[in-house]
Amino acid sequence: MKAVRNLLIYIFSTYLLVMFGFNAAQDFWCSTLVKGVIYGSYSVSEMFPKNFTNCTWTLENPDPTKYSIYLKFSKKDLSCSNFSLLAYQFDHFSHEKIKDLLRKNHSIMQLCSSKNAFVFLQYDKNFIQIRRVFPTDFPGLQKKVEEDQKSFFEFLVLNKVSPSQFGCHVLCTWLESCLKSENGRTESCGIMYTKCTCPQHLGEWGIDDQSLVLLNNVVLPLNEQTEGCLTQELQTTQVCNLTREAKRPPKEEFGMMGDHTIKSQRPRSVHEKRVPQEQADAAKFMAQTGESGVEEWSQWSACSVTCGQGSQVRTRTCVSPYGTHCSGPLRESRVCNNTALCPVHGVWEEWSPWSLCSFTCGRGQRTRTRSCTPPQYGGRPCEGPETHHKPCNIALCPVDGQWQEWSSWSHCSVTCSNGTQQRSRQCTAAAHGGSECRGPWAESRECYNPECTANGQWNQWGHWSGCSKSCDGGWERRMRTCQGAAVTGQQCEGTGEEVRRCSEQRCPAPYEICPEDYLISMVWKRTPAGDLAFNQCPLNATGTTSRRCSLSLHGVASWEQPSFARCISNEYRHLQHSIKEHLAKGQRMLAGDGMSQVTKTLLDLTQRKNFYAGDLLVSVEILRNVTDTFKRASYIPASDGVQNFFQIVSNLLDEENKEKWEDAQQIYPGSIELMQVIEDFIHIVGMGMMDFQNSYLMTGNVVASIQKLPAASVLTDINFPMKGRKGMVDWARNSEDRVVIPKSIFTPVSSKELDESSVFVLGAVLYKNLDLILPTLRNYTVVNSKVIVVTIRPEPKTTDSFLEIELAHLANGTLNPYCVLWDDSKSNESLGTWSTQGCKTVLTDASHTKCLCDRLSTFAILAQQPREIVMESSGTPSVTLIVGSGLSCLALITLAVVYAALWRYIRSERSIILINFCLSIISSNILILVGQTQTHNKSICTTTTAFLHFFFLASFCWVLTEAWQSYMAVTGKIRTRLIRKRFLCLGWGLPALVVATSVGFTRTKGYGTDHYCWLSLEGGLLYAFVGPAAAVVLVNMVIGILVFNKLVSRDGILDKKLKHRAGQMSEPHSGLTLKCAKCGVVSTTALSATTASNAMASLWSSCVVLPLLALTWMSAVLAMTDKRSILFQILFAVFDSLQGFVIVMVHCILRREVQDAFRCRLRNCQDPINADSSSSFPNGHAQIMTDFEKDVDIACRSVLHKDIGPCRAATITGTLSRISLNDDEEEKGTNPEGLSYSTLPGNVISKVIIQQPTGLHMPMSMNELSNPCLKKENTELRRTVYLCTDDNLRGADMDIVHPQERMMESDYIVMPRSSVSTQPSMKEESKMNIGMETLPHERLLHYKVNPEFNMNPPVMDQFNMNLDQHLAPQEHMQNLPFEPRTAVKNFMASELDDNVGLSRSETGSTISMSSLERRKSRYSDLDFEKVMHTRKRHMELFQELNQKFQTLDRFRDIPNTSSMENPAPNKNPWDTFKPPSEYQHYTTINVLDTEAKDTLELRPAEWEKCLNLPLDVQEGDFQTEV
């Protein structure tokens, strides 16, 4: 019944249409869409139903990237008489696009206007549409013309790269038929295709002529039967069945072509009136295809749609028991017409371009609109707003002064008669170059009162006077006078003066006013804190620049950086004006090359990096205009233009522009506008792309992905960004941010929603630095991740799908991270703000946060930033700094006091260096505390910083000076006054030079800031301290290594004598040290040991103090520059206190010299005769005597019974080996022996070389002493011993000495001039004794020692000498006690038995030294630093001699001349002497001539008894000075 009802309704509506007008049929429309077909043939009457004026026929290309559609139109003469056929192609099946295409009349082919019978067309886009158009005067319904059935269309889908054999055969058939019909005219048969080669005869294809005819009026659907017809070679599973199953029996209505007539299964219009005819055709079709083996057709299926034009399908099966194939199709479809019209919903058209700003200056508004296609047949209207507004800001408008409201009228000026009333108004201040208010500021009018009596009347008030002060409250006044008072009348009531306050604002203090400044070629005038100062922009820009004067935390006014947000460069301004002019003229054609050129120019400008903050806003405005122009012109930018666009965005978002963005966004939030521009541009690019096409854009700061996806093709979730993509930038490849877009977001809920809009443009953008330039949020909330954007057009309908977003944190230490998205509907200015609505935080840890969001937007992570601890300046340093600096200073001051008390004992270069070092540290600590309280005073802070810089460097340099001094001491370098001056230059001069250079170059800029009094951490000024300090540490390490190498390596000592002694240092008690504190008795082995000890102490001091010093000053710098951290202050206090304690321990408590000096101080070790004993010792050192040394000293003084002063001179006199002279005295008066006498202190020394006798029992005369003929072979290995003699033998010395003998190493004995008392003995005048009066004073007897001479040390354990014993002619000899040395051959030989018998009773003056013997081993090897004290300054390290020597014990009587004149004949007695090694040897020296026979007696003295010791010593060197 329902079908009958629909049929009756259809017939009735057709009847009404025929009866009441034909013209109404012109409003009917129909459309046909053919897809999934590779070949077809349709007649015009089949394609367009009769009497339908607005019909289209559309063919869809399966894949435009692979296939092309070839169209052939066979035209008859009368087929196009009543209408026109238009053919065109397009990519998107959109009514708006088609209307726009028809309106432009671009690329539309008029098929009926062709003069040829055949028209060939080729198309490569998604859709081909043929439209039948009737003229405007079309009369209405017409009969069907037979020519319409003869004119038909053929189309072919052909592979572009490898065409199939079937396709080429069809093309060649078209060409063959065209050539036949045109009688060989080839110009009208042009088919532009080169992949196919047509044979000369069609039979070569292997297809008969009958099959060629079957290609007309047939449709081949794309199914399993025809799948192989699209490929060049058939696969095993493919067939190309062109067949007789599509053949149809001849039918006159459809035209006869050969033996058969083939009819395509065409779609029909919903308004076609031939329903019965269709049913008849179907019946005939079923009958004529009912061959044996083929079952009957099934019933037609239900119509695919409930409204509008749909389709019906029926099928049949083939039963062929004999193995034959069935002919004809097995599936058939037809168009079903449903009378119910489908509702057409209202559709928004595209947004119109943004209008120009509503105002040319100031805050304006831009508007865009869109229109809605009205709904039909009950469709829904359009949803959403019709207009859209957004703010715009081009430039600041000049603000003119505006009058405020008038005040109320004042009281009448008089109380009687006519007076006046006044009122005034205020004018607001003009800004940005605006004009002042125009017009009067006051008005007056008359007022009428009763007539006055004879009393006085007030005149009008005068004007207010100027304010007495400009600030801090002043006063202004006005006056009036009283007139008209009669004699009997009354005076005016009231007062004639009125006063009021003015200028009540507080005057700024001098430190609250920013001084005049010159910056960036602009002069900034004095401005109170809180105000803005304005200036013109630089010459290359237009606009105004501003600079704010603000107060610091300490209440001091200071200039901020200038703001260039209103400055626009001339190049940017010119580019902006050129675009606005084109937009105003409406030149759409500029969208092509014009906009591309604009982006290239803007790219060049942004790559220069020298733009202002205002240029950023102009660049965003230019990009907005370019995007709007592309949208308006429907222009698709080229790939180069797209890349340039995103490169411009990357340049604008560079991290270097962070400060410029912060400055620019104080006027307008350009970063938010930039995000919106990028989204719009992405969709413009995406709409111009083909399906399944994607574009990946990668720059230094932006990664973007643009994809065009049909909804049905999205089978998996989409991930962004793609880490493994080729060419991915490093920061995006290493990024841990990602977003997962679910596939369900593209899939509609039901298949009924699939329409032409089911193709989506997906855009995703990852910004690297956008979080840095977004507007600052309140409540210490910051963007703590990269910003990622996901956008899809058209927007998908709301689903239950969630976007999975995972973002990595940028900063550690933030609190409460949470997910947000950008919501532009919550802001009053249409710019938007961050919102948590629609986004929830799923999982968060210390480095990542995972979110689930139900909408598309811009996503990020917000977190709470910990609040900074602001430490207010209290005007006093912290307690920690005070404690640390105080303890360090206390320790160093204690050290200085100790050194001052013991200075006479420990004065040396090392002590002077230490005092200077302590002074630099104490000064640094004091300046650190001062700098903490003077940050508000710039001049004092700058001065404090400069001195702090100086003393910090000085402390490092004095450590280096100590290392240098140790190195020179170890290597034995001579240190003169010039060298000591270099110590001062290194310790104080080098830091002063560095600081002066730094201050000169920087002009004190950076010396002190608003927060601390130290070198600024910006600009590299800190390297003025770090660089020299690091260099000092490096050099100190090198010197330390060299010193250590010298101390541990004997081969490292170049000096022969030092090297020899270095070999003896392995035995610490190898020698005996004799120190007579007042007579200058010292040991030669003491120098090397003491020098090494001091060097090791200095080396250990450098290794400990220098790292501690570096740690202390490093923590001091951190404590001064970062007051918020208490850790650095604690570290400084610990290191600084430890530094002072270590210095006191190393240089005071553990230093041996200080210990000895302190003991001596407690024992009052001072000369009782001369309190000032410092001049008696080398280099001002007070010799600290041990018990043994005191015994020697007491013995010496008990005999002398007088001042030891002369002995001191003799002590100095005895230093003859390479002493250090004054630097202001040059060596002069050098004798032929190479020894300078005039320069020695006292000028009393000369020497005589006395040859050693070969035999011990042979007497020695003065003639033998004066014999200069010395054998070279005997002198090469000899050693020397010096004895004080008189000056009258100086000539003899000169004759004896030879040049080669002067260079020999020598040992010395210095005899004092006044230390021995000599008296002649009247009883023994005939006896020849050596007396000090006959023996020349102040002379040195130089003895040559035979290297072969040896002594037996055990024999001399006990030996006493008697000066009263008479000497025999040859047996009794002058005996000398010798000490055995392994390094030196002893030079005395005699029969030990003759002298061993000497007893202590024979010599009354012999003193037993048993107490000294008991302590002999204790003081056998005491090392000391030998220094000399000259008449102008202290001498430096004294280089000792490297020779073994023995001390003369006493002199005896000299044998007579007769005994001495009997030498061995023909032989030198010295040459024949062969001493036995088992005896202790003595040498008898005949000093005087035979003519000098004065009998002298050499009395034993106390000091001689000190020396008369059986010294049992081992290998070692020592030198005794008396």
Curated annotation (Swiss-Prot):
It comes from the Eukaryota. Pfam families: 7tm_2, AGRB_N, GAIN, GPS, HRM, TSP_1. The keyword Nucleotide-binding does not apply. Residues 30-159 form the CUB domain. Forms a heterodimer, consisting of a large extracellular region non-covalently linked to a seven-transmembrane moiety. Interacts (via its TSRs) with C1QL1, C1QL2, C1QL3 and C1QL4. Interacts via (C-terminus) with ELMO1, ELMO2 and ELMO3. SMART domains: GPS (SM00303), HormR (SM00008), TSP1 (SM00209). This is Adhesion G protein-coupled receptor B3. Belongs to the G-protein coupled receptor 2 family. Adhesion G-protein coupled receptor (ADGR) subfamily. One of its GO terms (cellular component) is postsynaptic density membrane. PANTHER family: ADHESION G PROTEIN-COUPLED RECEPTOR B3, ADHESION G-PROTEIN COUPLED RECEPTOR. Residues 902-910, 961-981, 1045-1098, 1147-1522 are cytoplasmic. The lineage of its organism: Eukaryota, Metazoa, Chordata, Craniata, Vertebrata. Disulfide bonds join C303-C336, C307-C342, C318-C326, C357-C392, C361-C397, C372-C382, C412-C447, C416-C452, C427-C437, C467-C502, C471-C507, C482-C492, C514-C549, C537-C567, C819-C851, C839-C853. Residues 693-869 form the GAIN-B domain. Residues 26-880, 932-939, 1003-1023, 1120-1125 are extracellular. One of its GO terms (molecular function) is GTPase activator activity. InterPro entries: AGRB_N, GAIN_B, GAIN_dom_N, GAIN_dom_sf, GPCR_2-like_7TM, GPCR_2_brain_angio_inhib, GPCR_2_extracell_dom_sf, GPCR_2_extracellular_dom. Residues 1-25 form the signal peptide. CDD domains: 7tmB2_BAI3. Keywords: Cell membrane, Disulfide bond, G-protein coupled receptor, Glycoprotein, Membrane, Phosphoprotein, Receptor, Repeat, Signal, Transducer, Transmembrane, Transmembrane helix.
